[in-house]
A protein has these predicted regions:
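N-terminal organellar transit peptides
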Residues: 1-79, 83-87, 95-235
Length: 235
């Protein structure tokens, strides 16, 4: 199993590094990967610093990490070293304090998927994406206090925020290494969904010979089946 996270223990302080794409390669194919992450998180005590440099990836894997970090009993400090884009920005919202390097960026946009089928299946895919978007907005709203419509509009525009703008809007709390002498931090750069996707594809390992997920609806169907199986005690 290829982990996209790494824990480092230092006395009473812990550091978690999330680097590269948040891959769903084994996350949804079985229950092993989320259990492994939770076990790693629970294996130590004390406050934890989460370093993020990620172009994003799977929204459901990011949601699992977000929830696990919110449940963690110690203080969770998020530090964005370079990029928290797409699904990685969801993870960043789990921090009780979010700090960004002056040259770091946060990118938020609408969720996307690939759907194949007739018009009814297309409508179901659209409805599912709308619901997933509402879930993402929940995390942004809880952190920033911004109006949902305002957040939704930012996602529609696919917004790239430099450190200063992220602090101004409430997505981050402060800027690292800022001595107050120069408020002109990083200038914004342009990101597109395609550039984020290309970055993800470059970092992902070769796809194993295991069944993949076609779209978000497939994942939700699998989750429903998995929960039903567990509740009935089936194999």
């Amino acid at each position: 199993m290829n982990k996209f996270w790494n824990f480092i223990e230092q006395n009473d302080e812990r550091e978690l590094f999330l680097e590269g794409a948040i891959s769903d390669e084994t996350w949804w194919g079985d229950e092993i990967t989320p259990a492994a992450f939770k076990a790693d998180l629970a294996s130590g005590k004390g406050n934890i610093t989460v370093w993020i440099n990620s172009p994003g990836g799977d929204v459901f894997a990011a949601s699992e990490i977000y929830t696990a970090l919110k449940e963690y009993p110690g203080k969770v400090t998020v530090k964005i070293s370079a990029l928290a884009a797409s699904a990685a920005s969801i993870v960043a919202m789990a921090g009780s304090e979010v700090l960004m390097s002056p040259v770091a960026y946060m990118v938020i946009h609408n969720p996307s998927t690939i759907a194949i089928g007739d018009s009814e299946e297309m409508r179901r895919a659209i409805a599912t994406l709308d619901e997933v978007k509402e879930g993402i907005i929940n995390a942004y709203e809880a952190k920033t206090g911004l109006l949902r419509d305002e957040i939704s509009d930012m996602m529609n525009r696919e917004s790239c925020l430099n450190a200063k703008k992220a602090v101004e809007l409430g997505f981050a709390d402060s800027i690292l290494y800022n001595d107050g002498e120069n408020d002109d931090t990083a200038s914004p750069v342009l990101f597109s969904r395609q550039s984020v996707m290309n970055s993800i594809l470059e970092k992902l390992p070769p796809k194993p010979d295991t069944p993949g997920w076609v779209n978000i609806q497939d994942r939700l169907t699998w989750l429903s089946h998995y929960k039903t199986k567990n509740q009935s005690g089936g194999k």
